[in-house]
Amino acid sequence: MRAWTGSWRWIMLILFAWGTLLFYIGGHLVRDNDHPDHSSRELSKILAKLERLKQQNEDLRRMAESLRIPEGPIDQGTATGRVRVLEEQLVKAKEQIENYKKQARNGLGKDHEILRRRIENGAKELWFFLQSELKKLKHLEGNELQRHADEILLDLGHHERSIMTDLYYLSQTDGAGDWREKEAKDLTELVQRRITYLQNPKDCSKARKLVCNINKGCGYGCQLHHVVYCFMIAYGTQRTLILESQNWRYATGGWETVFRPVSETCTDRSGLSTGHWSGEVNDKNIQVVELPIVDSLHPRPPYLPLAVPEDLADRLLRVHGDPAVWWVSQFVKYLIRPQPWLEKEIEEATKKLGFKHPVIGVHVRRTDKVGTEAAFHPIEEYMVHVEEHFQLLARRMQVDKKRVYLATDDPTLLKEAKTKYSNYEFISDNSISWSAGLHNRYTENSLRGVILDIHFLSQADFLVCTFSSQVCRVAYEIMQTLHPDASANFHSLDDIYYFGGQNAHNQIAVYPHKPRTEEEIPMEPGDIIGVAGNHWDGYSKGINRKLGKTGLYPSYKVREKIETVKYPTYPEAEK
């Protein structure tokens, strides 16, 4: 009996691995074999065509906008100059129209379809492999069972990396990669223009203002997120953010000694009337509103994460895997524009450390978080995911050295990592680790260290950390501003991404689920699930809001519920 008990333990382990892999694959595959009836397939095709037509219509609208006769002088201000510009625009328009005609005629490109079929075949072959190997496990025991289970896990890794590599190339075919680059750039520039307009009113004395004091009693990452929260409320209520940062615990000279001012025209909090936050409607006749920390905010406005602007939601859903993180990252991007001295410091540190790609960022928090907000994680737990991602990177690029940027507040960890993993090149500045200790944390030197750590972590090709750490989440947010979509470029050993003080994080059940154990909860398609966390084993934990039951459910059976809010669109920023 013991042999069979051991066998079934391994069988369950492999099935969990299979379920996790299906979660990754399921979000990308074009076909859904669980819904084979003809009407569902036809509906999917119609919806896909409608989405393509919608995007083409939007592109044509932008094209028509660009074809308007330019106002004011062009070139030398002559009629010839105007004609030349219009001719160039007309040629460009004809090229784009021809591209649309080809798309309508030919559908998806050859490379796209070849890769789609390869992924489909890869998923089938993986299932065939699992069925065969699990049957073999039933007849094994002892060391032979252990050896065979290890081999299965090794082979599963190869299968998973092959499918993920094909999915990456699929995302780049038929100009999709170029489109994603351009669309992400356009969206970023649009939002940054809106923020810049809001933050630089023509007459500061008449501007509606929201005052935010940076000195919340916590560390740098937490304080930065506090300012981001203030900024999002300011943006939503159409108020210029006034950041009070004198006698900042990290730099007594204030925010502006490290980063560029949040406004070039309006830093004075004075106004005809001042009051504490009492809600957007109640404060409409108050010129200057003081905002508390998010923990004390009442009433709560709709502009808190994880909501995204309604006018950008459709575009964000197409271009980014986590629109809520992208939206937060736009405010972080604006806030942390460095002063020249800091820019120079970053450049010098890059050269001194020899920071280059490919590189994976690892952040290990060991001091104040351990035992309270987070569990202790040995370096081995991080390095498992580092090695996995390097093997994946090697499928599509040359990995000359396996580099790891190690950021930690434990000065002894660098030596331990180098000893245990001599085949890796660890990039780290131990002086930053010393300055991150509890006794040195709130100094200008410590601030410099944490800024550098966050910078290099965000620049990495992949991030392994604990999302319970604000530093890790800030690095992940900045990473989103450096790529069209870096939402999947991380592995957290504990929490899923969250923003302190956020509104409820909900998911929607896509497939039904019948509990197999008392720990699991039932689901029907359409049920709203309030997610508490992902266990990173194929299961998440949450509450079925319809039933009021809390427990585990398969992660692949849900999708994110995107919350949208009617943010102001600031059309004046485009003039």
Curated annotation (Swiss-Prot):
Region annotated Important for donor substrate binding, chain positions: 365-366
Enzyme class: transferase
Cytoplasmic side: 1-9
Localisation: Golgi apparatus, Golgi stack membrane
Modification after translation, per record: Tyrosine phosphorylated by PKDCC/VLK.
Keyword Endoplasmic reticulum in record: no
Membrane topology summary: Single-pass type II membrane protein
Pathway: Protein modification; protein glycosylation
Transmembrane domains' residue ranges: 10-30
CDD domains assigned to the protein according to its UniProt record, in alphabetical order: Fut8_like, SH3_Fut8
Extent of motif SH3-binding: 299-305
Pfam families reported for this sequence: FUT8_N_cat, SH3_9
PROSITE patterns tied to this protein: GT23, SH3
Annotated catalysed reactions: N(4)-{beta-D-GlcNAc-(1->2)-alpha-D-Man-(1->3)-[beta-D-GlcNAc-(1->2)-alpha-D-Man-(1->6)]-beta-D-Man-(1->4)-beta-D-GlcNAc-(1->4)-beta-D-GlcNAc}-L-asparaginyl-[protein] + GDP-beta-L-fucose = an N(4)-{beta-D-GlcNAc-(1->2)-alpha-D-Man-(1->3)-[beta-D-GlcNAc-(1->2)-alpha-D-Man-(1->6)]-beta-D-Man-(1->4)-beta-D-GlcNAc-(1->4)-[alpha-L-Fuc-(1->6)]-beta-D-GlcNAc}-L-asparaginyl-[protein] + GDP + H(+)
Keyword hit for Transmembrane: yes
Function (record text): Catalyzes the addition of fucose in alpha 1-6 linkage to the first GlcNAc residue, next to the peptide chains in N-glycans.
Family membership: Belongs to the glycosyltransferase 23 family.
Protein name: Alpha-(1,6)-fucosyltransferase
Source organism (scientific name): Mus musculus
Lineage of producing organism: Eukaryota, Metazoa, Chordata, Craniata, Vertebrata
